[in-house]
Swiss-Prot record:
GO terms for molecular function: ABC-type vitamin B12 transporter activity; catalytic activity. Belongs to the CobB/CobQ family. CobQ subfamily. Pathway: Cofactor biosynthesis; adenosylcobalamin biosynthesis. It comes from the Bacteria. One of its GO terms (biological process) is cobalamin biosynthetic process. This is Cobyric acid synthase. The active site is at C329, H427. Keywords: Cobalamin biosynthesis, Glutamine amidotransferase. InterPro entries: Class_I_gatase-like (IPR029062), CobQ/CobB/MinD/ParA_Nub-bd_dom (IPR002586), CobQ_GATase1 (IPR033949), CobQ_N (IPR047045), CobQ_synth (IPR004459), GATase_3 (IPR011698), P-loop_NTPase (IPR027417). Pfam families: CbiA, GATase_3. Residues 248-435 form the GATase cobBQ-type domain.
C-alpha cells in the first residue's frame, strides 16, 4: 500500500481537481485507489453508503475511483454555522458545535479518527490518494495539524505541491511555501505541478528550469487551463454558464449567508434551457418563473436575513403573479408556519415565524437524518433520486399533499393546494433528468429535455484523467504510488 498526498500553495490551487484526475488515471490502469481528505471545511456534503456525510469533493473523487462514497474518505468534516464556529462531524456523524479554540483542543481526538480511517483505507486499497486543505504554510495553524504536513508526517507519505499559475505569482507561491516548511517537511515534497496554464509553454520553460535548480525539486508537469470544466465547486458558488439559445426558463436562487449544498443547482446552471441567477446580499430578486429557497446550515438566522433583504415581499408578489416557489431542505422549513430550535442546534435556542406558505411546522432535533433515497415526484410521477441531510422534523396538515413518495414507504415534503409552492427535504433532485423535466414543466417551460448530469460529470472526470496522461510525468507518478513501470 502507498499513500500519496497532494497539497496546495493556496486555497483553490487545484488540489481537489488534481486528486480527482489522479484517481481516475490510476483507476483506468486497474489500480485499486481510494480518495482521502483528513479534514475538510465545507457546507456542501454528500451522504455515504454507510449512512454518514462527507465533503462533496470526496464523493466526486470516489466516483473517479469507481467507488461508493464512504465516511472513511473524509473522517473530519467542519460545517461552519457562524463566523467563529462550526459543526464538527467525525466519521460521518455530528459530535458537537465548537468555536475555533474548542476545536483546537479537540484536534488530538480528531487526529486519532483521521489515522483510524486512513489505516482502514490502507488495508483495502493499493493506493490512497490524499488531498490537503488550504496551504501547509499557514504558520498559525501548524500546531496539532491534521490536514496537511501534520498528517503527512504521521503516516510518512510523499507530497506533491500544486500551484495555480492563472492567478499569477506561481513561483513565489511554490518557493515561499517550501521555505516556510520544516526541513523534514521540505524533504517530503517530491515535486511540483503547475495548474491552469494558458499560453506558449516554451515561454514558461526558463522559469521551470530555474525552479528546479533553485529548489532541487522536479516539476512533474504543467496542466493547461481546461475550459468548460464543471465539476462541483466545494466552497464558492460557481455561477459560470455555457452560452444558451432558444426558449429558456428564468430561475432565481435566493442565497443566504449559510447556504448549504448549493451544488443542487449545478444541473440548472448547465441546463441549455434555464437562465439561472443567484441573488445575493443587497440584490433584488429579479422577475423569474421559479424562485428557489435553498438549503441552509442556520435556517432561522437565514430566514431573518431573507426578511432583512426584502425578499419575503418579493416572494409574495411573485406568487400573486402566478410564479412558482420551491424550497429545498432548510428552504422547505422556511416555507412553513414555525421553526423551533429548543436545543440551540443552529444558534441560540428559540423559535421563528416562517413564511406560512405551507401548513407545516418544524422542530430541530439532535439526531440528523442522513440517507440516500429514491422515489417519485407528485408532479407527473417522475422518478427521482437524491439524499437527505437535515436535523429538522416537519409535521402538519400540509404533509397530506406530499411532494414525493419514496421507495422506502415514506412521503416527503409538501405541495400547496394551489400547486404554486413545493417543498422537499431532497437534495440533488435536479440531477435526475425525468424529475428535472417535470419540475421545469411545472415552473412553465413547455418543451424540455434535461441533460444527463451524471454523464456530464463522468465526461469531465475523463477529461481530467486525459490531462494527467498527456501533461504529467507518468513514470514518476507511478513510482511515487509504489507502482512499477
Amino acid at each position: 500500500m502507498t499513500t500519496l498526498m497532494v497539497q496546495g500553495t493556496t486555497s483553490d490551487a487545484g488540489k481537489s481537481t488534481l486528486v480527482t484526475a489522479l484517481c481516475r488515471w490510476l483507476a483506468r490502469q486497474g489500480v485499486a485507489v481510494a480518495p482521502f481528505k483528513p479534514q475538510n471545511m465545507a457546507l456542501n456534503s454528500a451522504v455515504t453508503a454507510d449512512g454518514g456525510e462527507i465533503g462533496r469533493a470526496q464523493a466526486v473523487q470516489a466516483q473517479a475511483c469507481g467507488l461508493a462514497p464512504h465516511t472513511d474518505m473524509n473522517p473530519v468534516l467542519l460545517k461552519p454555522d457562524s463566523d467563529t464556529g462550526a459543526q464538527v462531524i467525525v466519521h460521518g456523524r455530528a459530535v458537537a458545535c465548537m468555536d475555533a479554540a474548542a476545536y483546537h483542543d479537540y484536534k488530538r481526538v480528531a487526529r486519532e479518527a483521521v489515522l483510524a480511517s486512513h489505516r482502514r483505507l490502507a488495508e483495502r486499497y493499493r493506493v490512497v490518494m490524499v488531498e490537503g486543505a488550504g496551504s501547509p504554510a499557514e504558520i498559525n495553524l501548524r500546531a496539532n495539524d491534521i490536514a496537511n504536513m501534520g498528517f503527512a508526517e504521521a503516516v510518512d507519505c510523499p507530497v506533491i505541491l500544486v500551484a495555480d499559475i492563472d492567478k499569477g505569482g506561481v513561483f513565489a507561491h511554490l518557493v515561499g511555501t517550501l521555505a516556510l516548511l520544516s526541513a523534514s517537511e521540505q524533504a517530503r515534497v517530491e515535486g511540483f505541478v503547475i495548474n491552469r496554464f494558458r499560453g506558449d509553454i516554451a515561454l514558461l520553460e526558463p522559469g521551470l528550469d530555474w525552479l528546479e535548480t533553485h529548489t532541487g525539486k522536479p516539476v512533474l508537469g504543467v496542466l493547461p487551463y481546461l475550459h468548460d470544466l464543471h465539476l462541483e465547486a466545494e466552497d464558492a458558488i460557481d455561477d459560470r454558464q455555457p452560452a444558451k439559445t432558444g426558449e429558456r426558463l428564468k430561475v432565481a436562487v435566493a442565497v443566504p449567508p449559510r447556504i448549504s449544498n448549493h451544488t443542487d443547482f449545478d444541473p440548472l446552471r448547465l441546463h441549455p434551457q434555464v437562465d439561472l441567477v443567484f441573488v445575493g446580499p443587497g440584490q433584488r430578486i429579479p422577475p423569474a418563473d421559479l424562485i428557489v429557497l435553498p438549503g441552509s446550515k442556520s435556517v432561522r438566522s437565514d430566514l431573518a436575513f431573507l426578511r432583512e433583504q426584502g425578499w419575503e415581499a418579493a416572494i409574495r408578489r411573485h406568487l400573486r403573479y402566478g410564479g412558482k416557489l420551491l424550497g429545498i431542505c432548510g428552504g422547505l422549513q422556511m416555507l412553513g408556519g414555525r421553526i423551533a430550535d429548543p436545543l440551540g442546534l443552529e444558534g441560540a435556542p428559540g423559535e421563528s415565524r416562517g413564511l406560512g406558505l405551507l401548513d407545516i411546522d418544524t422542530v430541530l432535533e439532535a439526531e440528523k437524518q442522513l440517507r440516500n433515497v429514491r422515489g417519485r415526484l407528485a408532479l407527473e410521477g417522475a422518478p427521482v433520486s437524491g439524499y437527505e441531510i437535515h436535523a429538522g422534523v416537519s409535521r402538519g396538515a400540509g404533509l397530506d399533499r406530499p411532494a414525493l413518495g419514496l421507495d422506502d414507504g415514506r412521503c416527503d415534503g409538501a405541495l400547496s393546494e394551489d400547486g404554486q409552492v413545493l417543498g422537499t427535504y431532497l437534495h440533488g433532485l435536479f440531477e435526475s433528468p425525468a424529475a428535472c423535466d417535470a419540475l421545469l414543466r411545472w415552473a412553465g417551460l413547455r418543451e424540455v429535455a434535461s441533460p444527463d448530469y451524471h454523464a456530464l460529470r463522468e465526461r469531465d472526470i475523463e477529461r481530467l484523467a486525459d490531462l494527467v496522461e498527456a501533461h504529467l510525468d507518468g513514470a514518476r507518478l507511478r513510482a511515487l504510488c509504489g507502482l512499477s513501470g
